[in-house]
C-alpha cells in the first residue's frame, strides 16, 4: 500500500487487454488468483483482516512512464467459486477457477 498525498492506494500492474477494459470503464471487477503476493497487499498481517483502501491505481506494464488509471476502491471480497470476467468491448475475457480475490472498482478517472 502506498500513500499519495494521504489516501491509501492499492497499486496493481495489468497487461494491455485488461488495462484497456479497466480504463474504458467496462471492467468493474479486478479478479486475482490467490497467492502469497496478493494476500500481502490485501490482508493486514497483524490483524488478519482485509485492508481498506481509498483508491486502486492500475498501471499498464512495468515500463517507466507507463499510463495509469485510478479508480475508487469499492471493496475486496473472497470468492470460492469459479468466476469469468468479460467479454468486454475489447474482447478480453478470462475464467478463474477456485478461490479468488475480487476487487470492486468504482468511479473511474484517468491520471
Say what each PLM segment does:
Residues 2-111:
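Structured alpha/beta reader/binder surfaces that contact nucleic acids or chromatin modification marks
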Amino acid at each position: 500500500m502506498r500513500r499519495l498525498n494521504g489516501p491509501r492506494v492499492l497499486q496493481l500492474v495489468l497487461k494491455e487487454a485488461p488495462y484497456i477494459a479497466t480504463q474504458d470503464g467496462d471492467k468493474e471487477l479486478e479478479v486475482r488468483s490467490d497467492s502469497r503476493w496478493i494476500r500481502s497487499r490485501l490482508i493486514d498481517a497483524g490483524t488478519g483482516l482485509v485492508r481498506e483502501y481509498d483508491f486502486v491505481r492500475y498501471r499498464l506494464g512495468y515500463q517507466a512512464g507507463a499510463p495509469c488509471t485510478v479508480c475508487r476502491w469499492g471493496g475486496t471480497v473472497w470468492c470460492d467459486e469459479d468466476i469469468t470476467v468479460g467479454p468486454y468491448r475489447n474482447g478480453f475475457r478470462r475464467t478463474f477457477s477456485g478461490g479468488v480475490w475480487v476487487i470492486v472498482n468504482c468511479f473511474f478517472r484517468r491520471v
